Amino acid sequence: MEPLKGLILSGGAGTRLRPITHTSAKQLVPVANKPVLFYGIEALVDAGVKEIGIIIAPETGDEIRAAAGDGSQFGAEITYIVQDKPAGLAHAVLTAEDFIGRSPFVMYLGDNLLRDGLRNLVATFTDHEPDTLILLTPVDDPQSYGVAELDGEKIVRLIEKPKDPPSNLALVGVYLFTSLIFDAARSLEPSWRGELEITEAIDKLIDDGRTVRSEVVRGWWKDTGQLADMLEANRLVLEELVTSIEGDVDEASKVEGRLVLGPGAKLERSVVRGPAVIGAGAHVEDAYIGPYTSIGDGVHVRRSEVENSIVLSGSVVEDLGTRMEASLLGKEVKLTRSEGMPKTLQLLVGDRSEIKLV
């Protein structure tokens, strides 16, 4: 089998993470201070896939190009492919046909995280050479997913959000294809959603007698499309954190557990209970940083408590008077409590934001 190429889909609108994704691609929202997209690129490179195409949308493509560059920082060669409209995964495959050519390839949804990466999956594909290999994971609510019906490791059919699921094994968003997928995708008509569905293209391969096999996820998998999933992914990644202190910790501060403290960062009269990561140039003063917290580059936290949260670069959290927990703050957000009476709330809140006051 000739070398595999990689195809990462990063064109989605990220509606479930608004308002963060009004101004940023959802695949660039960080987990443990690293954009989710970068985990996918690194997983492909680790599996030996170094020629990678990234599907981008016109609205967020420039930001993704600026972040990932030409791929050299990952040891990869990246080509950017514009999908003019979100017309389905099979449409994205067809959009990338010129890049893929006749090569087999890995298709990876750019907001996924896999603990154990792709190395074993790619090895299975190259060793056994099925026409398609799909990654599956057990879920508690298969009615909410695309689900596979299996005969051993062979997939008999795929069913989208079944009322009576034939299994609890859901599609993860990682697929390995040969070039046969292009003709299958071309044969499709748009679904009721107006999209070309990848599940229908795979079913076409099954109907044509092609070999479509499955592998079950080893370790954990997370789709980071919603706040709760993003925070859980952050927790899972931080669970495996290795301590690295490059910044300054004064004598009045206390660090318990594992911490990554970036260069130029400062802890002053503060307590950090890890696992936690604090980015370059961040300043934590008279504050408490609790477990499973990611503080971005240049963030200032003063006289406040933050736990189980993600705070993006350049933000300020100051004088809150209560603990902030299970939260995601975007870039350059300023969150403060003013002194004086009367005790009131003064808010400037963008469209489709969510604020919970306790």
Can you describe what each PLM-predicted range is?
Residues 1, 180, 187-358:
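Left-handed beta-helix
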Residues 12, 111, 138, 226:
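Active-site glycine-centered loops adjacent to acidic/histidine catalytic or metal-binding residues
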Residues 12, 59, 179-180, 228:
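Alpha-helix/helix-capping structural signal
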Residues 28, 148-150, 214:
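A structural signal for short hydrophobic beta-strand segments in well-ordered beta-sheet cores
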Residues 29, 174-175, 223:
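Residues that recognize and position ribonucleotide moieties
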Residues 81-83, 135, 215-217:
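Conserved beta-strand termini and adjacent loop/short-helix elements that scaffold enzyme active sites
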